Design a protein with these regions (language model features):
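Glycine-rich dinucleotide-binding loop and its adjacent helix/turn
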Residues: 110-172, 207, 267-269, 491-499
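Short hydrophobic core segments
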Residues: 6, 103-113, 156, 234-244, ...
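Rossmann-like dinucleotide-binding cores of NAD(P)H-dependent redox enzymes
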Residues: 59, 152-153, 160-218, 298-304, ...
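Beta1-alpha1 glycine-rich phosphate/pyrophosphate-binding loop at the start
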Residues: 1-77, 166-189, 328, 401, ...
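Rhodanese-like catalytic fold shared by cysteine-dependent sulfurtransferases
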Residues: 417-428, 432-469, 477-510, 514-563
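FAD-site-proximal beta/loop scaffold in flavoenzymes
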Residues: 125-149, 221, 225, 233-310, ...
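Mid-to-C-terminal Rossmann-like scaffold of FAD/NAD(P)H-dependent oxidoreductases
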Residues: 1, 284-396, 428-432, 436-462, ...
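A Rossmann-like FAD-binding core segment of flavoenzymes
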Residues: 25-27, 69, 75-96, 103, ...
């Protein structure tokens, strides 16, 4: 069997190695347009920033190591320009020599990935306007940074690569401005959760110009102007385009393969295309979203590697299935970690899923053990079935651990209530006896059993302030004096029982505290005394973060003043 693989990064390289493990006698040829294979896309910004010191550390394998260990024929700096499905051949052009030749195949695997989205704007070809997708892109940017010593940079786009580059450039002393049309960074997060990311970026000197549209670029001596549709141009020493990626599928289209959403390659669960003996994997293919069941584009290394393995199994006569992706991701931004899995509120609304949510502010580990850091968790679940839909976490330590637990729970099709039963490891340096994931389950259990009702930050301003409802802030007087919601009366939780006679049982009570715990306790107390009560999800901290983009402070025992 002769297998030709087009593309040698995540999906292609994984498939090549897997095929060899399954079939020692297969002839495997991997053709890669760039000069590198099996490189770490996700590590490229950290090489620019000097966190990864040596270029060699970016490549997990080389053409030589692929041959020595796997006897795989890797051809870099060569581009497949055409596919003949009937003749089962590909046309290849050697980029350095210009030589053109054909290669036959028994099985063909397409792993071309995606290319940076470059809008048709004036000035994008400037030598000071960069994209970042390949090792060559990385080397070009690093040479520029080391040689020109830029003091200012504009990043067009606020996705993963854009934010990682913003962090690395800022850590090098470059003044960074992020410009993008959407009004929030990191699309997988809801806008309220993205507020914490905005605050962290600003805290480290990164300027955000959100809701603004780039109209073009213009060279201005040793700088470049970023032209904005409704604002004055931005002057900078360099520009990075990071507005997203587009599936690289011109080969598939020209060969007559069926295409999916946004021009991606349509495949089945076996990673087979519409043409026999042609498979496709990675950022170029559409997938089924595990939560919604709808077609989606999810450009992440994890799914690409899994798809490569599955395609290899089936090429070698197996029967493996790719059951979909839920888009689990994690990102480091200065001292913050942002992670998500499944769908957010916008996606749930688009899919027509009736959902509810909880917001909590747990600590990374037991607060009495030194070094505990706060995190903000948001968990979505389907109202009727209670199945988990998605989760978002932003904070310090322990974010990755919790998002992976929740991602596993979603994959296992657990209900939100089953989170309460998870037996998770505990020791004071690592967690609490009630892990944050358990706590999310407890909160959902109380909501669904009717023990408590909640309202959300975007409902605060619409609460009645005409005396027809009681608005209570149950934090300490010290906390209340530092800032409070308009119209809320301060009655500390520990004093609430002494003030019950001052409340009218015929009027609803809305309760607020710092993070939602004490207001929950207050509602449980008030409910048992005959009051109709609801508490603010996420509390004053979440409201403030969303409304003013201020980060929550380090955790301390709820109800105690931090001296």
């Amino acid at each position: 069997m002769k297998v030709v693989i087009v593309g040698g990064v995540a999906g292609g390289a994984s498939a090549a190695a897997r095929i060899r493990r399954l079939d020692e006698h297969a002839q495997i040829i991997m053709i890669e347009r760039s000069g590198y294979v099996s490189y770490a896309n996700c590590g490229l910004p950290y090489y620019v920033g000097g966190v990864i010191k040596e270029q060699e550390e970016l490549t997990l394998q080389t053409p030589e190591s692929f041959w020595d260990r796997f006897r795989i024929d890797v051809r870099v700096r060569q581009e497949v320009t055409a596919i003949d499905p009937e003749g089962k051949t590909v046309t290849v052009r050697a980029l350095d020599s210009g030589k053109i030749y054909t290669e036959t195949y028994d099985k063909l695997l397409l792993a071309p990935g995606a290319k940076p989205t470059v809008p048709a704007l004036s000035g994008v070809s400037s030598e000071r306007v960069f994209t970042l997708r390949t090792v060559e892109d990385t080397l070009r940017i690093r040479r520029f940074v080391e040689g020109q010593k830029p003091k200012t940079a504009v990043l067009a786009g606020g996705g993963f690569i854009g934010l990682e580059m913003a962090e690395n450039l800022a850590e090098m002393g470059v003044s960074v401005t992020i410009v993008q049309r959407p009004k929030q960074l990191l699309a997988p997060l809801d806008a309220d959760m993205a507020s914490f990311v905005h605050a962290e970026m600003r805290r480290h000197g990164v300027a955000l110009r959100l809701g603004e549209t780039v109209a073009g670029f213009r060279q201005d001596g040793d700088s470049v102007l970023t032209l904005l549709e409704e604002s004055e141009p931005l002057h900078s020493d360099m520009v990075l385009l990071a507005i997203g990626v587009t599936p690289d599928t011109h080969l598939a289209k020209d060969a007559g393969l069926r295409l999916g959403i946004r021009g991606s390659i349509a495949v089945n669960e076996r990673m087979e295309t519409s043409v026999p003996d042609i498979y496709a994997v990675g950022d170029a293919v559409e997938v089924t979203h595990f939560v919604t069941g709808q077609k989606a584009l999810i450009s992440l290394a994890g799914p690409a590697n899994k798809q490569g393995r599955i395609a290899a199994d089936n090429i070698c006569g197996g029967s493996s299935r790719f059951t979909g992706s839920q888009g689990s991701s994690v990102l480091k931004l200065f001292g913050l970690t942002a992670a998500s899995t499944g769908i957010n509120e916008k996606a749930a609304q688009t899919a027509g899923i009736a959902y509810d949510k909880v917001v909590l502010f747990p600590a990374s580990h037991a607060t009495y053990y030194p070094g505990a850091r706060s995190m903000t968790m948001k968990v979505l679940y389907e109202k009727e079935s209670l199945r988990l839909l998605g989760a978002q976490i932003v904070g310090g330590d322990g974010v990755d651990k919790r998002i992976d637990v929740l991602a596993t729970a979603i994959r296992a099709k657990m209900t939100a209530l089953e989170l309460t039963e998870l037996d998770l490891s505990y020791a004071p340096p690592y967690s609490s006896a009630k892990d944050p994931v358990n706590m999310a389950g407890f909160m959902i259990e109380d909501l669904e059993s009717g023990k408590v009702r909640q309202f959300h930050w975007d409902e605060v301003d619409d609460l009645p302030r005409d005396g027809s409802a009681a608005l209570l802030d149950v934090r300490t007087e010290w906390e209340y004096q530092r800032g409070h919601l308009d119209g809320f009366r301060n009655v500390p939780l520990d004093d609430l029982r002494e003030h019950l006679d001052e409340l009218d049982r015929s009027k609803p009570v809305y309760v607020n505290c710092q993070t939602g715990l004490r207001s929950y306790l207050a509602c449980r107390l008030l409910t048992q005394y005959g009051f109709a009560c609801a508490h603010l999800a996420g509390g004053y901290s979440f409201y403030q973060a969303v409304m003013k983009e201020r980060l929550a402070q380090s955790p301390y025992p709820c109800g105690m003043e931090k001296l």
